[in-house]
Amino acid sequence: MGSTFSGIELGKRSIMAHTDAISTAGHNISNANTEGYSRQRVQLKEFDPLYRPELERPERAGMIGQGIDVQSINRVRDEMLDQRITAQQNQESYWDTRSKYYTMIEQIYNEPDEVSVRSNMDKFWESWQELSMNPESQAARQAVVTRGESLTDAIKSKWENLMGVGSLLNSDIDSTVKQVNSYANQIAALNSEIIRSRGMGDNPNDLLDRRDLLVDKLSKLANITTDQRDPDEFMVHLDGKVLVQGGIARNFDLVSLTDNNGYEKLVWADTREDAFVSGGTLGALIELRDVDIRNEIQSLNTMTMNFSDLVNDVHRNAYGANNVTGLDFFTQHSFVENVNGNFDRDGDGNFDHSYIFRFTGTTTLNPQEQIGFEGVMTFSGPSGNVQVPYHPTDTVETVINRINDSNGEVKAYLDRNNNLVLKGTTAQNVENPDFVIRHVEDSGFFLTGYSGILSASGADGAYDFAHADAVNSLAGAQFAVSPVLNPAGYIEVNNVIKNDVKSVAAAFRDDSGNVNAGDARAAVEIASIRNTKVMIGHERTLDDYFADSVTNVGLKGEQAENNLKSHMAIMNDLRTMRDSISGVNIDEELSDIIKFQHGYNAAAKFVTIWDSLIDTVINRLGV
């Protein structure tokens, strides 16, 4: 027969099981508002029954139940849903970051008319137009100087605002990288704790919740995926690279760049290799700083560099009312100081590069003339060199267009004297300097004897900026050194002109070499730059530049806002779904507590009854 005391053990197990169930429900209620908490459920099962192989077995039940047992306490989670949220969440934070920063950029472009670059540029051209109609008027010359100063102030103000956004982005990148490193280290530490806990037979639900919360936060910062092929090794991958493997975490570091406004690039701390992050807050911040803001600053610098160079080219060849000539109207205070463009790029005290912005050939060319020979020109490009071929039937204009249509970071045009001009553009790679011609080579004669830029054909006669005195490869061509810093941040009206407005040059010498006080041909030529294709990145006028800039910023801002709304709607649905599965419902937990309380009370009553039965056997049989 069964043990007389077996009922006490059975009742004890029931009381303990219902106690655990009530405690778990209370734990759920306590953490109803805890971020990342998943509700827990007690998994109950029948305790192993007794198998009694006795002689009377055929006449009686052979297996006697022993009550209940707590099998485990588990979190209520949907792993597939969690993985989907992890994959989707980085896109929401990516577009949220872009939307926030494009709001700032749009504010820079939506500045009031009286201080905008475009408005002041229009007034600057109008002042030259007025001077062309009144070349003997000192008031008209003063207007040119005053409006020139207003224009440079507007350009510098816009540059400072864009640089301010860039600095803010750089600061945000720094703090976000620290967050990523912190989350990765915490996840690795939790992995070790979870493995130890499971090794002792525990089910570390709260540790798992903390790890999942960190993964959630990390997925907002970068494009990550998780997997656990080995039950004891939880892994986090970032854009295909291992970030966390079990108890080991990799970290990021930031390294300053010489030619990127002092900004820093992201590298892996252990290997020092470049790290690439797409998606998430960090991916958006890096893209905004190194692509969007960099493009806006480069665009402003390109406009400033080209328009001032064109104005100066006319002005220095013209004469003022005081017969002064050779003056640039605009000056920069940040050009390479060495006359040959030699520059110490690595900071070791020795010249190691040549920073040249513009070459001007020595030969006057006819744009419609067929060149009559063939060859291949080589120019520096975004990643390596770019080759541009030419053929005997090509005209000069065709060859120039082919250069400009190529992916080379050099642009070409014929100047006012029909001499070929090559100019360095902004660099796509952040590690290359802007407005620096890095490589020019010609296997034939177009850039050598025909246009008068290079002294010899082939590799031996090539110009390459990677050493000092590279200008020695030029065939007497004029050249202009490059700016070291941003042209838009340091442009000014020449102090000589500001101190004496008569130095504003509006006239050219006539055929006899005399300067006529009523001549205004230079003023007309400068005023006409407004509607001339001046090679701002592509063949565009200054008006085209301003229209394109505002349109591009507006479209990108609209794109960010629309994509943010779309991803927010998706994420709201996914979070609602997860909350319905893993979230704590107070009413449901209270209902469970009442249910388990009744079970507890019944088990206690059962123990009391069994106690009375034992008391009868022990004390009341009268034996």
Residue ranges and their predicted role:
Residues 1-623:
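Structural signature of extracellular appendage/secretion-system components
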